[in-house]
Amino acid sequence: MRLIFILLFTGAFVQAQTLIEDSEISENSEEFVRVAISYELDHPTEYYRLKCGSPVYARFTGGESIFKQNISRQMKGFLDTGLYTVNGTFELILFIGKNGSLQRFQLKPEVANGHLLERDVELALRNMNPSWTPATCNGIPVDSRIRQKINFRTDSFDL
């Protein structure tokens, strides 16, 4: 009985295995990841057909290459890499009014949480403030639509 009492008494002071919490380990290792959205405007600008005898399609002031440079520069500033990732080919359809102003746009295909990308593209287009020479049918200005395909790719980098 005395031996059991001594063993219990000394066993109370011996430490068992200690548990290490996961948070202590993960505090020392931080992961840095950079996300970049790249896009290509290599596809030619396409015009929806006007149904008239002698159509003249809408043109961006400065031409197609200046339009692509401007939209590329504006999208670089407005696409938010922290909120979403985007991959694949999208169609940006621009609706040009009779007065040569951008009336609205449409981004296809529609994807889940695509409203964030649409918001950023809208901000880029507003900031670009595009001026167009309106389309005409037999010398009369008409509404027109222009389609530009954009190929998006999201890349992640470890720093």
Where are these regions (language model features)?
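Charge-biased low-complexity segments
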Residues: 17-159
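Sec-dependent N-terminal signal peptides
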Residues: 3-13
